[in-house]
Regions:
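Core nucleotide-handling region used for phosphoryl-transfer chemistry
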Residues: 1-381
Length: 381
């Protein structure tokens, strides 16, 4: 099952006849090893090969792309009733637009991310040359492609710091297309070789993810390097056969990202608990215990050393205490803002009663905590 499946229904106004077409068909299911999923983990470090279209030993080369730490974003274009129509969105929420004024027609809350994607895509298209826009529209219409992006939004940051961005930006990842025949047979996860696809996107004028090309014999070394790297989420590896078909994908995340994200989630949950229960009923020791339990589980998945685990536990506990103190100070000072922050035209809930929107602002709070306490999250293992 592909991500973001979206079916377009066209109804003839005279005859009432309906035709259906798959408009969005993004990347299909792929996974990683233990520790590479955000929630439930695979049973072992080889489950990812179960999703391959061919045996792993059919691999002729591997393309490694940097994993952007944002939200999924999709684009499809069709020529309908003498004009190009864009289908844009994220995950399973998409909308049809022709220009910026159409975005406001999708006011329901579930379109929040889709609206941000739409605005970012139109910004990119407006910056392209007329020749590139004409090529893009005709290319995507005639080949029935989906363009897969990641949207980096400085208002909704995860673990990587995006504060340097003035507005949301897209990073092109790949071109995809729907099944090749009615029997749902598929020979490749991507419409073209990812290297060719990224190079083409760059020529059109898109910003893209970075990539490297390695040999199949270098995969284990590459995965180990990624795991030990610092400061970014990880990489996605595309396995290609001798015919340039993408026969499988693998996500591999840095240990830094896996642990930092776990701390973010544990501390955010503790903050929610503090806000709901109040300082008198909030059990800090219990929250510390949950944090430690989670980090010990990650140690097993990633095979971290005892010394690195101890270092992460110390930092995690310190950050938990730091955030709760911020919440207590905010509540004590009664810092309630009546103004809502705005980013890319989307209103964001302002700070009030200790709610510091930790999940969306984690990188800044994390960085401030480390600086104030003279700590480093560059932990060797």
């Amino acid at each position: 099952m592909a991500r973001g499946n979206t079916i377009l229904c066209l109804r003839d106004q005279e005859t009432g006849a309906e035709t259906y077409e798959c408009m969005i068909f993004a990347l299909r299911k792929f996974t990683g090893g233990m520790g590479d999923e955000d929630e439930q983990q695979p049973e072992d470090n080889k489950v990812w090969t179960d999703y391959f279209l061919k045996p792993l030993d059919s691999t002729a080369k591997v393309i490694c792309t940097r994993k952007a730490n944002g939200e999924a974003a999709h684009l499809a274009i069709r020529f309908i009733e003498n004009k190009f129509v864009l289908c844009v969105g994220s995950k399973n929420v998409h909308m049809l637009i022709c220009d910026k004024s159409d975005i406001d027609k999708y006011s329901d809350g579930r379109f929040q991310v889709a609206r941000a994607v739409a605005a970012a895509i139109l910004n990119v298209i407006n910056d392209l040359s007329e020749e590139s826009v004409e090529f893009l529209c005709n290319f995507m219409h005639h080949l029935r492609l989906t363009a897969v992006f990641e949207i980096l939004n400085p208002c909704t940051q995860h673990v990587e710091d995006l504060s340097h961005l003035e507005r949301s930006e897209l990073r092109f990842i790949s071109w995809t297309s729907s099944y090749e025949d009615r029997k749902n047979n598929a020979h490749s996860y991507c419409a073209v070789n990812p290297q060719v696809g990224i190079d083409l996107a760059q020529k059109i004028g898109f910003k893209t993810v970075r990539y490297d090309i390695i040999q199949p014999t270098e995969v284990d070394e590459r995965m180990d390097k990624i795991r030990h790297d610092y400061g970014y989420e990880g990489e996605v590896l595309y396995f290609l056969d001798s015919d340039e078909n993408v026969i499988g994908l693998l996500k591999k995340k840095t240990a830094w990202y896996v642990v930092a994200r776990a701390i973010r989630e544990q501390v955010a949950n503790a903050l929610n608990d503090w806000n709901k229960s109040g300082s008198s009923k909030y059990d800090h020791a219990a929250r510390e215990e949950r944090l430690v339990k989670r980090l010990k589980a990650i140690k097993q998945w990633l095979d971290l050393s005892e010394s690195s685990l101890s270092a992460w536990i110390e930092i995690g506990k310190g950050f938990l205490a730091y955030v709760i103190k911020l919440a207590e100070k905010s509540a004590k000072d009664n810092q309630v803002s009546v103004e809502s922050e705005k980013c890319d035209g989307v209103s964001q809930k302002a700070f009030s009663n200790g709610d510091i929107e930790l999940r969306n602002k984690f990188p800044q709070h994390w960085k401030t905590f480390l600086q104030q306490h003279q700590k480093s999250d560059r932990i060797m293992w």
